[in-house]
Amino acid sequence: MNVIVVGGGKVGRKLVEDFNYEGDDVVLIDIKSKICDRIQDDYDVRCVCGSGTDLETLREAEANKADIFLSLIHI
């Protein structure tokens, strides 16, 4: 499955870990490059640094191909 997770906090990171473990293709979107770098170092996932509400970021993450899209950000 193609999974996009927006937000690399505690819950987002755990979901990235679980989906990655199951062999799914995971893309993480986070506005903080430190979080993207850390998660990319720990898991075999692609990271897009940017806002999950920005159309260019969503295009780069190929959101149109997602089977699952999870937004885990707080406002």
Each model region followed by its residue ranges:
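Cytosolic regulatory regions of ion transport systems
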Residues: 1-73
